[in-house]
Amino acid sequence: MFYPDPFDVIVIGGGHAGTEAAMASARMGQQTLLLTHNIDTLGQMSCNPAIGGIGKGHLVKEIDAMGGLMARAVDQAGIQFRILNSSKGPAVRATRAQADRVLYRQAIRTALENQPNLTIFQQAVDDLIVENDRVVGAVTQMGLKFRAKAVVLTVGTFLDGKIHIGLDNYSGGRAGDPPSIPLARRLRELPLRVNRLKTGTPPRIDARTIDFSVLAQQHGDNPMPVFSFLGNASQHPAQMPCYITHTNEKTHDVIRNNLDRSPMYAGIIEGIGPRYCPSIEDKVMRFADRNTHQIFLEPEGLTSNEIYPNGISTSLPFDVQWQIVRSMTGMENARIVRPGYAIEYDFFDPRDLKPTLENKFVHGLFFAGQINGTTGYEEAAAQGMLAGLNAARLAADKEGWSPRRDQAYLGVLVDDLCTLGTKEPYRMFTSRAEYRLMLREDNADLRLTEIGRELGMVDDHRWARFNEKLESIEKERQRLRDIHIHPQSELLDQVNSLLKTPLSREANGEELLRRPEVDYVQLTALPLFAPGLTDEQAAEQVEIQVKYEGYIARQQDEIEKQLRNENTLLPADLDYKQVNGLSNEVIAKLNDHKPSSIGQASRISGITPAAISILLIWLKKQGLLRRSA
């Protein structure tokens, strides 16, 4: 039978991608259905109990800037907050939080259940209803049919998932959850390129069996950071430390002596695992010269005795896992409460997607998360938000939207996936972005909140706070520009106390702040420049904008140049052997990829800026230089 009520958008899957997709669609006013196999696992943290990190924290801030959920949830659930790379420049600073799994899940579920236009229904999905190359609904395992104008698939590792522990394996979506086999078979019938990937998780340890007294502690930052632009530290629950131990030669001997029992090294697992989160057996073999690896013992929650040993993801047999754990300092008597495992699953080539994350071959069908070949909660959530908002726009007969590479890390993520594809689980890093100085955590709202408002994602409260912040920044910068001090001033000694080189000419507040030895708090502590802003976010923006103004202007010039490249079209039938000066490697790659524009060509691995310059000169000489409108 068909469900009595029609929907505009159906989201299949209630993980990090699915919850953001459902929230985005519902916030935009579309009647949205979230189908999940288990309502109790909405927002489940399937692997590590943490949000954020290098590149990942940037994505969380971008989700928040557009009204998304993840940052608000982790502010309510985080039990240790830190700023990574705090001693480096603002472009690469990143927020990370350990999270209480239960509190995080509760925060997500509460938000979903209180979101207007959103219906949650518990049933696994076995089939899609496709008519004339257009998806029009979904069918659950009990045969119940739902109709919708768009469907978002956020099925994580569940598509034909297979769990491996040693040489044994069984079907599963993750530990304790069934796989989605009928839906995987249905998707393989569609004209889509499918392959397999693998990821893994470490064993969980009973905290009561660890000797923490011999381990180094790691505490969070004080004052505590927050993730959401609307958040504050008073929302955080009680805080907990992490602990650090290390593998050793005994650990590595155990692993090397049992590689024949590893499903990866025995050839049982065919899927490729994440390069930047390798298993402990991979670490030992790939970095054979290292006799130790750092392992972080991370609490899973305020009321849980489970510890997540970050750094020993493994699919070795349980008896080997037991030996590995007990070989490390402080863990000599440790007990495993959940074994580590690897999981293989289907993913679909993201080059078959539009930048809106709509499938090129099945109209109205959107993919987000691990189904696109990514790894990580944050990458999934960001894609989910984008897919959800574009599904809502399609349902409303509006054009889709996708951020550019210079606008957001989400733009980098989507462009990398849709242009280059991936053969291994894709993880976000700041190094993937060309315009890191523009794509900072601290300015995610300045980049995206106005766009989110135009799209219908940002509510009145966030919009009002955003405009107050903008006004504060501009007024404060103008105030500093209007305050001058000259070498004859009686206040000169106060100012010179901050400077490495005494003031020799008249200067205003911004010029003083631009000096590397002067920070905003010091400057506004001087009577002449007091009082400073009490809004810490606005004050941070004033300092960064002033200090990095020249660098930001240069990067903006680069962006404008790159935008010209994006609009410079390449002939579809061009044989790059004709272009004098290109290396054989570059010619082969360009002929293989057939990029549609100079911008796309520039992002192909191995295509250098010099090659792009040669290509532009050749196009101009041949009279083939064309730009899109």
Swiss-Prot record:
CC terms in the record's Gene Ontology section: cytosol
PROSITE patterns found in the cross-reference section: GIDA_1, GIDA_2
Domain of life, per lineage: Bacteria
Residues the record lists as binding NAD(+): 273-287
Keywords: Cytoplasm, FAD, Flavoprotein, NAD, tRNA processing
Cofactor(s) needed by this chain: FAD
Subcellular location per the Swiss-Prot or TrEMBL entry: Cytoplasm
Single GO MF descriptor: flavin adenine dinucleotide binding
Presence of keyword Flavoprotein: yes
NCBIfam families: mnmG_gidA
Assembly and binders: Homodimer. Heterotetramer of two MnmE and two MnmG subunits.
Protein's name in the database: tRNA uridine 5-carboxymethylaminomethyl modification enzyme MnmG
Organism the protein comes from: Pectobacterium carotovorum subsp. carotovorum (strain PC1)
